[in-house]
């Protein structure tokens, strides 16, 4: 076990430092958080889907659960990747990016791989707002982070800032994902009625 302190804290820096600690002979990196659990059989399902030339796996992720224990928000995630050719980017809500010089990546869909997130509702998420502000400062045209910052301002009841950021999100030419655009519009409506 290696213990390190990442200061100032950024999720991408911490994940990239962790990647540096992965043994050189590793082929595949599986990134999970301490509050996430794979369903039994995930490794066999991953190995069946991963073929020569694969560099990243797409698999099912349950982000939260309803009060009755049924699945809440579910989507596909891509945090399993080849040992080389990837780096994490963004201070928060970090994502994998293919590095230059490694050629195009090739994804596989890993049917049967299921990761469940069991968030601790008592855990503070207070660090997210300043990290999202930093993310948008670093990359002002990243539609995903602009949306997340508008949403975070909404959570903090900072209505005017939320409205400005969500409108900015909707105006970005890269903001084409219908689900996220819809979320921005719903939050805008709530901002106006707050």
Annotate each predicted stretch with a short phrase:
Residues 3-11:
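Short, acidic/glycine-rich phosphate-metal binding loop used to engage nucleotide
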Residues 136-139, 170-185, 194:
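Flexible helix-coil transition and linker loops at the boundaries of alpha-helical arrays
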């Amino acid at each position: 076990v290696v213990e390190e302190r990442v200061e100032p804290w950024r999720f991408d820096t911490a994940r990239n430092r962790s990647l540096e600690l992965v043994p050189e002979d590793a082929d595949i990196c599986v990134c999970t958080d301490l509050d996430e659990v794979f369903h039994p059989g995930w490794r066999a399902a991953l190995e069946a889907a991963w073929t020569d030339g694969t560099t990243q796996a797409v698999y099912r992720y349950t982000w939260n659960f309803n009060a009755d224990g049924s699945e809440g928000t579910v989507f596909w995630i891509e945090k399993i990747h080849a040992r080389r050719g990837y780096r994490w980017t963004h201070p928060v809500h970090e994502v994998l990016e293919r590095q230059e010089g490694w050629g195009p990546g090739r994804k596989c869909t890993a049917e049967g791989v299921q990761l469940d997130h069991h968030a601790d509702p008592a855990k503070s998420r207070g660090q997210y707002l300043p990290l999202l502000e930093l993310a948008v400062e670093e990359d002002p045209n990243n539609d995903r982070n602009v949306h997340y910052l508008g949403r975070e301002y909404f959570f903090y009841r900072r209505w005017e800032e939320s409205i400005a950021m969500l409108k900015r999100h909707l105006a970005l030419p890269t903001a084409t994902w219908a689900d996220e655009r819809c979320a921005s519009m719903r939050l805008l409506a709530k901002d106006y009625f707050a």
